[in-house]
Amino acid sequence: MMTLRHLPFILLLILSGELYAEEKQCDFPTVENGRIAQYYYTFKSFYFPMSVDKKLSFFCLAGYATESGKQEEQIRCTAEGWSPNPRCYKKCLKPDLRNGYVSNDKVLYKLQERMSYGCSSGYKTTGGKDEEVVHCLSAGWSSQPSCRKEQETCLAPELEHGNYSTTQRTFKVKDIVAYTCTAGYYTTTGKQTGEAECQANGWSLTPQCNKLMCSSLRLIENGYFHPVKQTYEEGDVVQFFCHENYYLSGSDLIQCYNFGWYPESPICEGRRNRCPPPPVPLNSKIQPHSTTYRHGERVHIECELNFVIQGSEELLCENGKWTEPPKCIEEKEKVACEQPPSVENGVAHPHSEIYYSGDKVTYRCGGGYSLRGSSTITCNRGRWTLPPECVENIENCKPPPDIANGVVVDGLLASYTTGSSVEYRCNEYYLLKGSETSRCEQGAWSSPPVCLEPCTIDVDHMNRNNIQLKWKYEGKILHGDLIDFVCKQGYNLSPSIPLSEISAQCNRGDVRYPMCIRKESKGMCASPPVIRNGDIVSSAARTYENGSSVEYRCFDNHFLQGSQNVYCVDGVWTTPPSCLEPCTLSFVEMDKNYLQLKWNFDNRPLILHGEYIEFMCKRDAYISETSIAGSVLRVQCDRGRLKYPKCTPRDRRLSFQEALRTRRQMEKR
């Protein structure tokens, strides 16, 4: 029975628990341009959050130092977080200054420190002065100190593939010279023209004209291209080909322009992604016409005059086959049309009291007007086809229409007359549909193209549908591209169709993800395999259903190699992981090899498999290997074994006392 005398002890426990909880203030620190000891990363959940007043060391990467200029420094956990903020800055070293001098003898400069330097007679600083002050910033010196020969004049360099605006070749300081590159060549900023200023230390930039290059092309799946180069010059054309049983989707020819490759590289699709020409019923026509038809595309069937459709007006391309086509059956009775529609500023010929299917009329416009559309319309089963318009003759068009996710790349003018045209290009990853060119005709532009949106993979949607990617996709997926999935282990497309590979098509930014369901049980598994230095997280059962899994864990300080989960597949377990032993630091081996630890934080009883530890030779010893000393003294733990490097003691002369001691020993003998 609890009494009042137990109350202080209980309160103490509660308060100390609250205080302990409040002390855990500091999360895992991120060290810019540096790191902390490896075991903190490995046992992150054990050490963090860290209690107030706890300390740890961090060290900087090569070429960086702490704010105080040290290679290693300690930080302390406070109620406000880590103090000081762990950060490493790029070291600012005293420059090796030719034809100049530095105002002090310091070798290393801390952050925000200033350094003053000057140049010898006849030389100027990078800013064109006799003396200059630079600051040590986090990325190095504010400007790299150097001394350049002072010049009263500048000589224009030889300009290949370009011309200067003047025949003059010698220029005074502050003179500016303009130059133009020949066709196909550009300045360093990618322009056709450029300027350079003559300064006391030479030209502000060296005039030059270079040929623009396009990047190398990535290989296409199930295809190849020719020619293959590391870089391509402007104007180069590359042709693409597909392997047997695959077809090109896109242009087979692409060209290197000053803005890059255009059009985009095609892809090679398999037979199942394409359909043959659609079956056209007798007495009909199809829209739209195309040279290729891809999975998911549709065509419209329209019967000829005096024929009616029986069945669906649309055909769908599905996995290389067309849906069932309709039939066009002849009408038994003629159907009359009303009088042709009237067109403003136009007349129709010939005139009749009654019109039947198949009858045609033609429109003509009055003076000062032109036809827009087909001049002839037809009576078709009681309805007239679309009549034309008579529009006023206007030569100029407004600026070309903008398109979503695309731009005009060629043909921009101050004004546009009939016959003018512009060329469109879609943004990266967007697929151009329609004609890339739009023309000005009688004051109106022909229809511009449409840029079809790409798709991005939705991982959450995939997880809900029990699927994963078959291949790794980089960046976006173009409209029309197929994405290959596989069912996750233990799942199938459906019980009746045991397919493991499934595909979906990108359609204007949308992907219809397939769904997999759990497989039917085909076999039970016995207890999961036993592993050395580890066990399973949950208690083992005698039997497991097909598709079930168990999770392994390693004993403390052991490194898990492989998948921590194994699965029961048709009565057999997948391969279990291995638990790799840690290494134990031996000070006996260190003394034998004249070694000591380079870093204090490496003084720990265990080093995990894969972790590195750095040694250094003791005083009056040197590394005996012929390799680079730094790499030899950095050792990795490999399955419980450390290969200690060997340092050799230096030869040294005997001291007076040692010589006297040696002499006495010799005399005793």
From Swiss-Prot:
GO terms for cellular component: extracellular region. It is found in: Secreted. Pfam families: Sushi (PF00084). InterPro entries: ComplSys_Reg/VirEntry_Med, Sushi/SCR/CCP_sf, Sushi_SCR_CCP_dom. Residues 25-89, 90-149, 152-211, 212-270, 273-330, 335-392, 395-453, 454-517, 523-581, 582-648 form the Sushi domain. Residues 1-21 form the signal peptide. Glycans are attached at residues 163, 546. Predominantly expressed in liver and kidney. Keywords: Blood coagulation, Disulfide bond, Glycoprotein, Hemostasis, Repeat, Secreted, Signal, Sushi. Disulfide bonds join 26-77, 60-88, 92-136, 119-147, 154-198, 181-209, 214-256, 242-268, 275-317, 303-328, 337-379, 365-390, 397-440, 426-451, 455-506, 487-516, 525-568, 554-579, 583-637, 617-647. One of its GO terms (biological process) is blood coagulation. Its main location: secreted. The B chain of factor XIII is not catalytically active, but is thought to stabilize the A subunits and regulate the rate of transglutaminase formation by thrombin. PANTHER family: COAGULATION FACTOR XIII B CHAIN, COMPLEMENT FACTOR H-RELATED. Tetramer of two A chains (F13A1) and two B (F13B) chains. This is Coagulation factor XIII B chain. The lineage of its organism: Eukaryota, Metazoa, Chordata, Craniata, Vertebrata.
